[in-house]
UniProtKB/Swiss-Prot annotation:
Disulfide bonds: none
Name of protein: Large ribosomal subunit protein bL9
Native source species: Bradyrhizobium sp. (strain BTAi1 / ATCC BAA-1182)
An annotated Gene Ontology molecular function: rRNA binding
GO biological process: translation
Gene name linked to the record: rplI
Keyword rRNA-binding: yes
Keyword annotations of the record: Ribonucleoprotein, Ribosomal protein, RNA-binding, rRNA-binding
Acidic residues compositional bias, start-end: 181-191
Segments traversing the membrane: none
Family to which the UniProt record says this protein belongs: Belongs to the bacterial ribosomal protein bL9 family.
Length: 197
């Protein structure tokens, strides 16, 4: 089916272009959401009549979206989740979680505006793109951590899996265990046991 786009649609075309799409996509998405009109002679004439109004509305919406993008751009959102020692999350962080975290920060976006290739399944930072308008995109940094303290360390760029403090504590534990366990003494006891038999 051929349709006339009433606004820019990602990976499809610009406003005013006549594009050929599958019937289901046209009926269930483009026409239903008023993003396009069927490309009939009558609708082509109708589009030409409302072209100036559509362009003016698009410029106005784009300006408002640019203001919102300025407010959002570069924000750092922290999401606290339970995770294993290796940093794998028990569950995942999805688009819905990001939208809720943004709303808690005073930013209202809808789920289709947040572009996330796959759910986040590990602790760390990830840049997420938000399409506020078909022509205006911005990004936020999502930090997933086990605690607020850990989130701060991740933001500073520390490698949380191999912290120096953890390595020092492990070395102290090994040294303390060495006081209770002397491998040479065990060898002497084993040798004494063999001679007694």
């Amino acid at each position: 089916m051929e349709v006339i786009l009433l606004e820019r649609v990602a990976k499809l075309g610009q406003m005013g272009e006549i594009v050929k799409v599958k019937d289901g996509f046209a009926r269930n998405f483009l026409l239903k959401r008023k993003k396009a009109l069927r490309a009939t002679a009558e609708n082509k004439a109708k589009y030409e009549g409302m072209k100036a109004e559509l362009e003016a509305n698009n410029i106005k919406a784009k300006g408002e979206a640019a203001k919102v993008a300025e407010k959002i751009d570069g924000r750092d959102i922290v999401i606290i989740r339970q995770a294993s020692e290796s940093g794998q999350l028990f569950g995942s962080v999805s688009v819905r979680d990001i939208v809720v975290a943004l709303a808690a920060d005073g930013i209202t976006v809808s789920r289709p505006q947040v572009w996330l290739d796959a759910p986040i399944k590990a602790i760390g930072q990830q840049k997420i793109t938000i399409a506020i308008h078909p022509e205006v995109e911005t990004s936020v940094t999502v930090t997933v951590a086990r605690s607020a303290d850990e989130a701060e360390r991740i933001k500073r760029g520390e490698d949380i899996s191999t912290r120096q403090e953890d390595r020092d504590a492990a070395a102290e534990a090994i040294a303390a265990a060495g006081e209770f366990f002397d491998p040479e003494a065990q060898e002497d006891e084993a040798a004494a046991g063999e001679t007694a038999q």
